[in-house]
Amino acid sequence: MFYQLLHSVLSLVGILSNAFMMYLALKKSPKIMRSYSVVITIKTGTDILASSMSFFVMQRIITDGSSIVVNPTGPCTSFGKSACYAGHMFMLCFLEYDLVWLITSYLFRYTILRGRELCIKKLVRIAFYVFIPSMVHMGVWISIYILTESESVLKGFGIETDDMILSGEIIYWSSITLLTQLFITACLAVVAYTFIRKSLSKFARKMSVIKTNEKNLRNRLVKVATFKLILPSFIFLGITVFVAMFTRLLDYQYGQYIVSVCFMFSPVCSPYAYIIFVPHYRKFIFGRKENVPKLEQGQCETPESPRNTPNLPYIYYI
C-alpha cells in the first residue's frame, strides 16, 4: 500500500511539475529563447509520458538472476497483462528517450557556442528521428510478447497466484535489453556532460574581457548541465539495485521496490534545472527582477557569426 502511495505521489509530482515547466517554455520564454524552448518542451513532454506510464503500471521488478518477474499493481491491471507489458515497455522507452534528448540538448548548447542556432523545424525533425529507433525496438518486443508464467517462479518469489505477474523468456530478455540500453545511454549522457563542460570552460577563458553579466552565462550553463547530471545518476542507481538483485547481492524483498522508484526521480527532478537556473522562469515564479541583456532574436542558422567569437550572449538564457 505504501509503495503504491509513493509511486502515485512521485508520478503526480512528475506530471504536474513537467506540465508547469512546459507551460513556462511555451508561454513565458523570451523570443531569444524560442528555439531552446522547443528543446525544453520536448524534454518535459517525454517526462510527462514517462511519469504517466509509471503511474499506469506501478510495477515492481523482481529477479534472482535465473528469471525476471514484473509485478504491476497500477491501473493497467484492469486492462490485462498485455496492457501492463506495453506500459512497462513504454516507461523504459520514454526513460531512454529522455536521456537521448538530454544528450541532444547538450549538443544544442554546443552548436550555439559555435555560433549557430538550429531553427524550430530542424529541432522537431531531430526529435522525431532520434525517437524512431526506440519506438521500433519497443514495438518489436510488444508484438512478440507471449502470456507465459511459471508457478514455480511465483512460489520462489513468494508471490500470490492471484497477483498479476509478467514473466517468461520475453520478459527476461526484453528487460535485460532495455535496462542495458538505459545504462549505456546514461553513460553517454555523462560523456556529453563532460564534453560540454570543457567547451564552456574554454568559452569562459575567451570571455575574459567581456562585461560581467555576460561572464555569468558560463556559470549558469555549467549549473544547469551539472544539475542535469543528477538525472542519469538515478538511472545508474536503479540499474545498480537491479544488478545487485540479479547477482543475489541484495535480497529481492528489498530491491523490488527500489528500482522503479529510482527511475521515477529522473523525470521528477528534471524541470527544476530550468526553474532554478533560467532567469526568465525564476523571475516569473518568484517575481524577482533579473539583470539580463536585451538582445535581438537569432536566426535559424547564423553561419555569418564568427565561430570563434566569444561574444555570444544570446545563450545566456539557456
From Swiss-Prot:
Q: Would you identify the family this protein belongs to, as annotated?
A: Belongs to the nematode receptor-like protein srd family.
**PANTHER family listed in its UniProt record:** SERPENTINE RECEPTOR, CLASS D (DELTA)-RELATED, SERPENTINE RECEPTOR, CLASS D DELTA
- Record's keyword terms, sorted: Membrane, Transmembrane, Transmembrane helix
The record's disulfide annotation reads none
Q: What is the name of the protein in this document?
A: Serpentine receptor class delta-25
Q: Which InterPro entries match?
A: 7TM_GPCR_serpentine_rcpt_Srd (IPR019421), Nematode_rcpt-like_delta (IPR050920)
The record's listing under Pfam families reads:
7TM_GPCR_Srd
Q: Where are the transmembrane segments?
A: 5-25, 38-58, 88-108, 126-146, 176-196, 226-246, 258-278
Stated membrane topology is: Multi-pass membrane protein
Q: Which GO terms describe its cellular component?
A: membrane
Location within or outside the cell: Membrane
